[in-house]
């Protein structure tokens, strides 16, 4: 029996999302997944793992609501922000009929999730300055239900102009939802749209504990939206989205003292990012270093140096972004520890075109 005949056609042709961990399995310095380089120290407290956990842990929700400056009924907690991306499509998009929009270069899971669910998508590239092409979006809103905007944008690191986002919210009012993916917003909180939630009922914000909170392995994210949207999402979320250990660690991570530790981590990352950018600009193999408001830096390299391959041979793992529109010869470098940033710069400064033979 050929099992493939039983599979959905869109799955047979699906190109799965290539996570940073899938792409590379070996290395000593991991600067490819935008993780915090040092693990926080939390201990598992709950012993009664013979019971199912609650679907929406109230202490986690209440503490994150306080941190984010919203009400508890405006929050859904999920298995990372990736699950939120999927839940929104399940609730608002009819397969084969409705459409989502995303604007590359950007995070790849918007496209992959739509393809898995059989949701049509419309690609509207950003302008050369990586800002939104509002005119093109406005002219292509037919059947659109969701517009996904990553801010700060991954992998470019830039902030989408708030004025553009406000204009977009007005353009799509009574037509679609704007979903702003704020996975990296903790590194530039002034750019958050969270204060706009009371004014725009069609605004949805995605958050995570993976980046600034240094808990990528936990898989815990949040959807911030008006209560009506949250109630709809609760209809389709799994009955036990978070395991008891995840709930336990998330509760600990959102206490006042832990949030202060997170703020200290953010300050360290921002300092190291500036050190990394300054050093990269002095490397002859670098053609351009793009400004960043997140925990990573996008860099365009001279292709003659084969930087990705050369550094990988030395145990330094970066993320190749060359397959994204407008990002030929670009690599994304996660901001690591001070020593990691200095080491990467030191290695890059020593590169010569002769390194092609490596």
Curated annotation (Swiss-Prot):
State the top-level EC class: transferase
Q: Which GO terms describe its biological process?
A: L-histidine biosynthetic process
Reaction equations catalysed: L-histidinol phosphate + 2-oxoglutarate = 3-(imidazol-4-yl)-2-oxopropyl phosphate + L-glutamate
GO MF: histidinol-phosphate transaminase activity; pyridoxal phosphate binding
Q: Which InterPro entries does the UniProt entry name for this protein?
A: Aminotrans_II_pyridoxalP_BS, Aminotransferase_I/II_large, HisP_aminotrans, PyrdxlP-dep_Trfase, PyrdxlP-dep_Trfase_major, PyrdxlP-dep_Trfase_small
Q: What is its EC number?
A: 2.6.1.9
| Domain of life of the native organism | Bacteria
Gene3D superfamilies per UniProt: Aspartate Aminotransferase, domain 1, Type I PLP-dependent aspartate aminotransferase-like (Major domain)
The coenzyme or cofactor needed here is: pyridoxal 5'-phosphate
Q: Which CDD domains match?
A: AAT_like
Carrying N6-(pyridoxal phosphate)lysine, the residues are 211
**Pfam families, per database record:** Aminotran_1_2 (PF00155)
Q: Which UniProt keywords apply?
A: Amino-acid biosynthesis, Aminotransferase, Histidine biosynthesis, Pyridoxal phosphate, Transferase
- Does the keyword Transferase feature in the UniProt annotation? yes
Protein's pathway: Amino-acid biosynthesis; L-histidine biosynthesis; L-histidine from 5-phospho-alpha-D-ribose 1-diphosphate: step 7/9
In terms of PANTHER family, this protein maps to: HISTIDINOL-PHOSPHATE AMINOTRANSFERASE, HISTIDINOL-PHOSPHATE AMINOTRANSFERASE-RELATED
Subunit annotation: Homodimer.
| Protein family per UniProt | Belongs to the class-II pyridoxal-phosphate-dependent aminotransferase family. Histidinol-phosphate aminotransferase subfamily.
Q: Indicate what this protein is called per its UniProt record.
A: Histidinol-phosphate aminotransferase
Q: Which organism is it from?
A: Blochmanniella pennsylvanica (strain BPEN)
Its organism's taxonomic lineage begins at: Bacteria, Pseudomonadati, Pseudomonadota, Gammaproteobacteria, Enterobacterales
